[in-house]
Amino acid sequence: MHDAADACSPDSASLTPRRSPRHPASERARVPWVAWVRLITVTASMGVLLSCGGGSSISSPPGAGGTAALTVPSEPASHWTQTFLPSDADFPNPDRGFYSSTTWDFLGEWDADGVQRAWSAGRRLLMARVQLDAWRDADLPPSLLALLSQRLDQARAAGMKVTLLFNYDFSEAGQDASSERIRQHLRQLKPVLAANAAVIPFMRAGFIGAWGEWHSSASGNSCTGRPEAAACAAAEAHRLTVRDALLENVPETTQLAIRYPADLMRWYSDPLQQHRLGLHNDCFLSGPSDTGTYEDESQRDYAAAVTQWAAFGGETCENGELPVRSTCADILAEGARYHLAWLNADYAPSVVVGWETQGCLARVSAFMGYRLQLDALAHPGQAARGEELVFEVALRNVGWSRLFTPRRLVVSLRHRETGAVWSAAAGDLRDLPPQATSSSRLRLRMSLPPSAQPGLHEVWLGVPDIFEATASDPRFSIRFANADSTDGQQAWSVAQGRFRTGTTVEVH
């Protein structure tokens, strides 16, 4: 079987690094959708992908989505125009959603039963907290690096990815390390993080201060005085050292989350000038300031803007400022405003259970992060060997946030008798705008060689992972937010990690 994910490894893909800077917010209203969603058209021969890059062009088809599927005709169709039925079901998907904490220390005993329970509950993210208090004044030992690599591999084997946090003091005391020691530790961690990038979509900035939340540092990495004071100037220099070390040593495919928007505002006056540093709010929906997260409304506006392209996650809390904004109206409004991508399922329990009692927990779970919906597909129903096939796919992202991990849309032809599969890929699906109310169209071109096997081929669509370690594992494929058709022609295959469209191509 030949698959696009096998042909384009992450190292050779044109999907990373991301393009920046982005359009300023003041200009966004004047920029048409054609400028916001980049299309990579890929030309492929049957059986081998020839290119992973290409030109750009997109349009938005009118009235896409919401129509029942067509059935396969008794004779091969000359041209297919297929539509798909959206679904509001809460489909678990990688790189997004509620996360679970199965162990206090990620390097402690592996809780296989707890991880399995999390998987069965629909979780696809684990909290991975790594305690470094024993090495505040020393290099990390090889044994720790090896154990971290082992735990990340165990997460992958369980079908899970992680949101990673390194800290020296998970208490209010804030007994952390110096910025130079933190930088050295990150340099040591770099090879392990790079080798396991496939399972680390999110990482809190961590390391500094109490709970790794960048406040109350005992090593001068934070301050509480006036910004112009000497101690605060020194703390800012230390924070920049750690920020730069994070950017240099954490894989570019991993979203980094800073605790406070004030830091991002000092570093990047334009919220759209960078895309790697997002936010984690660990007292989400708690009081007027989210318990010190925001100093004023301008910081909330900045957070809403920066998370258009960088990830926002965290947890709610029970012992913060009052009132706690724990109603369904609160989470549905602020989840969308801040493009919420990942959130603690276990804390605060009173808040999460409250959403369930009020009847919105399933919707929060379904729309947190990205949510890709197929609207329509058009392609010829017949093709001669040696000809080029063009597939046009209309889809949209109706989730609260965009995709942050590189992904391509893959079209596959599966021979109905032999089962042979041929694939081609296109697009950088991170560029699909979130909360979309109209669809974007991606065009894929596939050249059929003279040696192509004749016969009827089913057309499938999928979004596999791009990393070698996970590309062929259907558990890491993105499930579309579409219902199976009642006639059985359109259906998601759990075993294959892709969607049968109900259309065919007769190759002759």
Over which residues does each language-model region extend?
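Aromatic-lined substrate-binding rim segments of carbohydrate-active enzymes
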Residues: 113-169, 179
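Boundary/entry segment of secreted carbohydrate-active catalytic domains
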Residues: 69-124, 129
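Catalytic cores of secreted or luminal carbohydrate-active enzymes
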Residues: 327-379
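Catalytic-core regions of glycoside hydrolase
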Residues: 202-209, 213, 217-349
